[in-house]
């Protein structure tokens, strides 16, 4: 069974690296986007199961 595909939307590189390092350590599949516009493009292209974003 594939783990869920997670879209990480984060503009702060240190926070993004912390999140993606943790996801990678647990063998999760993930995509990243730096902002809302990039998130919309990634979500429409890849249909993630979960979106993590800051407000």
Label every model-predicted segment.
Residues 2, 13, 48-50:
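N-terminal functional modules and adjacent low-complexity/disordered segments of proteins
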Residues 54:
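Active-site residues of response regulator receiver
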Residues 10:
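Conserved acidic carboxylate
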Residues 32-50:
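Acidic, metal-coordinating helix/loop segments flanking the phosphotransfer/catalytic sites
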Residues 13-17, 37:
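Conserved alpha-helical interface elements of two-component signaling phosphotransfer modules
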Residues 1-7:
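Non-catalytic signal-transmission and effector/linker regions of two-component phosphorelay proteins
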Residues 17-25:
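Charged docking surfaces used in two-component/phosphorelay signaling
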Residues 26-30:
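A generic structural motif
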């Amino acid at each position: 069974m594939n783990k869920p595909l997670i879209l990480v939307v984060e503009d702060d590189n240190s926070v993004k690296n912390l999140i993606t390092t943790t996801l990678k350590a647990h063998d999760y599949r993930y995509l990243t986007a730096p902002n809302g516009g990039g998130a919309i493009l990634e979500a429409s292209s890849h249909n993630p199961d979960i979106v993590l974003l800051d407000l």
